[in-house]
């Protein structure tokens, strides 16, 4: 996220890394493409240049279900007594937020049986309760592009729930293709038909092994600790001199300022996403 305060550290400058965990949207998250001089390495799903400091990476956002690593590693498959759920946020800051709510409105009007949870809909204290009892759930990212998948997907896997997924365009590079079902929420009717067809075919029962593999990958490879540990271990073992470093907060450039101004105007006048 955007650095709002100054940070100090005593370490080699080569050991100062950043990992980007927000979707990139011009005028909304410009810190993802500028202000990186103090970082030796930037892990990001949106690589802004061919500078070798940039490494393509998923955001490695922590899971949101209220379970520890130890609990999740021994968790059996929960009893699946319900069909389809969607745990949805209430933000409306990005075009992806608007697309998501538009799709929710469509499937509700179409009469799709679904339990929807969220701060402004049906609040639940623990996201686990909106996933674990369900065979299927919708996992819809804030944007669509390579390498950008988040806890929206990981939480489904951890709860042994098959996700109808929209977002990361190269997700097959990370997880078994049978562990999720792709939908395109910009194609309302097509996505609705796919959801109905998959659920009618009892796909969840047939994909348990793929879900098991996917959740093991989340726990042991892709969550932030093993992810960073693997990257650090791959670094050359060199003796580097420590320094007293100051990492400044992000300050928008003039270009980013005007990008931000334009974005705010588009949001104010409802122009972030074309009306259907």
Which stretches of residues belong to each language-model region?
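Pol beta-like nucleotidyltransferase catalytic core
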Residues: 1-20, 30-120, 127-137, 146-276
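Active-site-proximal helix/loop microenvironment
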Residues: 142-144
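Blade-loop segments of beta-propeller domains
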Residues: 23-25
